[in-house]
Amino acid sequence: MFTVFLLVVLATTVVSFPSDRESDGANDEARTDEPEEHGPDRNGCCRNPACESHRCG
């Protein structure tokens, strides 16, 4: 009976460890180093279609 208990504890411990496989990004924090899409860029142009001011083509 004790052997079965140890086997269950070991199995749940192994399952609970994070895998070394590549992540799909679901748990990653939002990146802040990318440029803001809804504000004017360094030329003063807004690339967002919903932006009414500072449109540059």
From Swiss-Prot:
Skewed-composition ranges (Basic and acidic residues): 19-41
The keyword Disulfide bond is assigned to this record: yes
Pfam family, one: Toxin_8
A GO molecular function held by the record: acetylcholine receptor inhibitor activity
Free-text tissue specificity from the UniProt record: Expressed by the venom duct.
GO CC terms, sorted: extracellular region; host cell postsynaptic membrane
Function description: Alpha-conotoxins act on postsynaptic membranes, they bind to the nicotinic acetylcholine receptors (nAChR) and thus inhibit them.
Domain notes: The cysteine framework is I (CC-C-C). Alpha3/5 pattern.
Taxonomic path: Eukaryota, Metazoa, Spiralia, Lophotrochozoa, Mollusca
Organism, scientific name: Conus stercusmuscarum (Fly-specked cone)
Record protein name field: Alpha-conotoxin-like Sm1.2
Propeptide: 17-42
This protein's UniProt keywords: Acetylcholine receptor inhibiting toxin, Amidation, Disulfide bond, Neurotoxin, Postsynaptic neurotoxin, Secreted, Signal, Toxin
UniProt region (Disordered), positions on chain: 17-46
Residues where Cysteine amide is found: 56
